[in-house]
Structures are given as C-alpha cells and as structure tokens.
C-alpha cells in the first residue's frame, strides 16, 4: 500500500488492512480518516473493524464516507473538521487515495489557499487524476442559488441560507431557536451563527421561511425577523395545524388564521430570492401544512425525503398521512434529476458525518424507501416503521411555540414564560 505525503500533517493512501494500524501509530500518525462507505467492496474491512483497530492502536478515528461522484460541501466540511480536531499527523484513506486528495484539493480551493487551475497539477504531482475535482468546481460555479447548511446536533436539524450571488440577497429556511428541555433555557446560538454568516458574506435577508410547524425544535423566525426586518412566511395550510393543536392544547384564544406570519404561501405561489425565482409546492404527509420551496435548481424538501441512506420522514404526527407523504414525494421526484434536494434532518446512520444534499436522480436510484417501491409497499413500510417510533421529545414543547410563528408564550404576572403540556393526548409513549 502506497502512502503519499501531501504536507507535514496530511498523508493519503488506498485501503489499508486493519493489522497495519499499529504500524501507522509507530510511524507517528495520530488519526485515521476513513472515506469509504461500507459495502463498496466485499473484502473491505468496514467502519466497525477500522474503528476497533484504531482504538487498539491508540489512534483517533473519523468515519467520513463519501462517493466520488456525489461529494457535497457537507462532506468537505466534515473532512476539514476531522483534520482540524486532530493534533499531529493524519492518514486519510479511500480505495485508491483519489477521493482523499480530491477532498483536500476542494478544501484548499474553497478556503482560498489554492487556485482552481492548480488542482489538476496537484493531482499529477502525486500520481492521481483530479478531473472529478475540476468538474465539481466547474459545476459549483454555475449552480444557482448558493446554499449554506447549518447543522444543529442537538435536534439533528439543518438550517439553510439560500443566496443569490448576483444581488447578495438571501432567504433563511427553517432556523432553530435553541431550547434545553431539562432546564427550560432558550438561546440563540444557532440563529446567531446564521446572522454571522449573513454579515460575513455581506448579504441582505429577503425572506425567513419555515417549511412547516416543526415538532422537534423551536423556530427562530421571530428572533431573526427582529434582527433583520425580513418578513416571515409559511404555507397557508398552517391554519389547519393551528386548529388541530388549539384543540389538543385546549387553547381557545389561539388565532388559527395564520396571522402570526407576514405571508402565507399557497400551492404554486411564486416569490423571489434576489433575481432567482422561487416556487411553493404543497407537500403534506409529515404534517398538514408542509411545503417544499423550489428555488433555482434546488428544492428544500423538509421532512419528506431524508438522505438516500436514511429513507423518508415519519407520517404519524397528528394530521400526518403516509399516503399523502407518498404523493408529495412523487411530486418532488418529478423535478429534473439534477435538481439539488436539501433535507430538513439528518440522523447520521452508521455514525457517519452529517449530510443534507442529494439530487432527485440519486434519490430515485439509492433511497431504499423509494427505489423500486410502489405506493402500497411504501405506505405499509412507512406505517409499520412509524409504529416503532416514540414521539419526538420536544413535540409538546415545540408546537405551542411554532404555531405562533416562533413566538414564546407571553410572560405571566411574575415575569416568567410557561409551556403547557396536555397529558395522554398523544400515542407513542416509550416506556
């Protein structure tokens, strides 16, 4: 196995045997990064075996599985984090070393330490063909809009800043207001990270959009509106969710007319992010009010389709329907195959890094809930799976905030705010 030194901290290689890990430690490496998805080849060791071998050798270990033809910025960020969080020398491997060098080159270009026209020469200097990296950079340069994802590990949610690079105007989608259910504390860490990005990039926020009233996190829409002055929006069917939860919460004073948002989008409505046209698709199933935002060559599909290795979202919340979810997914999959899809959650199957971008074509080919599956099979699969899932731990906390557009309850006479929980209102207890 050939090891290629790229710089004083980074070396790359093809697939090593796990019995070589102890020798890597003796040679001074401190960390192994495995870029190979499990199952690429019948004889590869796999994530579990490599992790165990690294532990025995006293090496740090990171699993960042990527496919050379579908690398995303989330993959590049995970690669960068894995290197940055390790002291000392790092050995990165894939099958041949090409993906490892490709991720390094893309990282260097994105961070401004390397010019695009230097990528191929880097590959040739080390005996690799980086043509795919060049193609990736060329494709990224013409993608519209530019999408930046912000992963919240507490709720496994992804928040987005969607930017028109020409006008420097942007939309924020599904922002998270931090909440700790043990202490009852709220914070704006996630939202402030988004604001810092907006300021750093010199952007003007044109929209603050929620895809649906979330059951697993509080929306930061109101906080961001206060900070930016941008209007908030959601799908018009939010009124049905408000009426449903008004009854569950026994909340007769809740105005179930959607007035908590500045704009309600109907199916087919159009809007702009700078000079880029956006379109709203009604996508019920996960909730009664879910919408997909199609902006340029992207679609923000919230809790309908997860990453191809993670299947689809649940449909057993009050007002949910597996059959409606199937129909919504089929509408999404009718978009062009090259459409970039951005999901609302990633639960990191097999312990991999967070990912959130795929394409329509990738979903059709690789998602086990969709590839070769018909409606009847999907509904049976989805309903059976949902029966095994407990309710989200924040559903009763979050909905009373999110049906108000992200507003916290008003303070009571002692100046404190309170949440209200109905008992025995929902099925799905995990005893």
Curated annotation (Swiss-Prot):
Q: What induces it?
A: Repressed by BigR.
Q: Which residues bind substrate?
A: 309
Q: What is its EC number?
A: 3.-.-.-
Please give the cofactor(s) recorded in the UniProt entry for this protein: Zn(2+)
User: In which residues is Zn(2+) bound?
Assistant: 212, 214, 286
Primary enzyme class: hydrolase
Q: Which GO terms describe its molecular function?
A: hydrolase activity; metal ion binding; sulfur dioxygenase activity
Query: Superkingdom, according to UniProt?
Result: Bacteria
What is one Gene Ontology biological process annotated in the Swiss-Prot or TrEMBL record?
hydrogen sulfide metabolic process
Q: Which UniProt keywords apply?
A: Hydrolase, Metal-binding, Zinc
Q: Which InterPro entries match?
A: BLH_phosphatase-like (IPR005939), MBL-like_hydrolase (IPR053449), Metallo-B-lactamas (IPR001279), Mito_Persulfide_Diox (IPR051682), POD-like_MBL-fold (IPR044528), Prot-tyrosine_phosphatase-like (IPR029021), RibonucZ/Hydroxyglut_hydro (IPR036866)
Q: What else is known?
A: Part of an operon that comprises bigR, XF_0764, XF_0765 and XF_0766.
The function of this protein is: Could play a role in cell adherence or biofilm development.
Query: Which family is this protein grouped under?
Result: Belongs to the metallo-beta-lactamase superfamily.
Name of this chain's protein: Beta-lactamase hydrolase-like protein
């Amino acid at each position: 196995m050939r090891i290629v030194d790229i710089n004083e901290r980074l070396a790359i290689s093809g697939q090593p045997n796990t019995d070589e890990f102890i020798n890597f430690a003796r040679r001074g490496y401190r960390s192994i990064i495995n870029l190979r998805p499990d199952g690429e080849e019948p004889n590869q060791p796999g994530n579990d075996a490599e992790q165990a071998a690294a532990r025995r050798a006293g090496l740090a270990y990171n699993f960042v599985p990527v496919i050379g033809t579908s690398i995303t910025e989330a993959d590049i960020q995970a690669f960068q984090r894995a290197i940055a969080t390790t002291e000392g020398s790092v050995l990165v491997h894939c099958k041949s070393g090409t993906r490892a060098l490709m991720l390094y080159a893309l990282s260097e270009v994105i961070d401004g330490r390397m010019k695009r026209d230097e990528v191929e020469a880097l590959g040739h200097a080390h005996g690799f063909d980086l043509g795919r990296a060049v193609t990736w950079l060329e494709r990224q340069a013409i993608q519209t809009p530019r999408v930046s994802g912000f992963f919240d590990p507490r709720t496994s949610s992804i928040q987005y800043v969607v930017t028109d690079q020409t006008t420097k105007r942007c939309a924020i989608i599904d922002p998270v207001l931090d909440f700790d259910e043990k202490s009852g504390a709220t914070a704006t860490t996630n939202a402030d990270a988004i604001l810092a990005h907006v300021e750093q990039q010199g952007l003007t926020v044109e929209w603050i959009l929620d895809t649906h009233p979330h059951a697993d996190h509080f929306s930061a829409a109101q906080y961001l509106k206060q900070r930016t002055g941008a209007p908030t929006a959601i799908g018009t069917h939010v009124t049905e969710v408000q009426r449903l939860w008004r009854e569950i919460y026994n909340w007769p004073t809740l105005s179930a007319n959607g007035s908590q948002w500045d704009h309600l989008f109907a199916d087919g409505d159009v809007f702009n992010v700078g000079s880029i046209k956006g379109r709203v698709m009604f996508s019920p199933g996960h909730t009664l009010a879910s919408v997909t935002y199609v902006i340029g060559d992207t679609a923000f599909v919230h809790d309908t389709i997860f990453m191809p290795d993670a299947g689809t979202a649940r449909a057993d919340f009050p007002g949910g329907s597996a059959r409606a979810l199937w129909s919504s997914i089929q509408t999404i999959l009718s978009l062009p195959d090259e459409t970039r899809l951005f999901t609302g959650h990633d639960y990191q199957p097999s312990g991999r890094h967070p990912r959130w971008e795929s394409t329509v074509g990738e979903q059709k080919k690789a998602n086990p809930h969709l590839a070769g599956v018909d409606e009847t099979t999907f509904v049976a699969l989805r309903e059976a799976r949902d029966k095994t899932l407990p309710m989200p731990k924040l559903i009763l906390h979050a909905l009373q905030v999110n049906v108000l557009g992200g507003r916290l309850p008003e303070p009571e006479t002692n100046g404190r705010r309170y949440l209200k929980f109905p008992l025995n209102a929902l099925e799905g207890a995990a005893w």
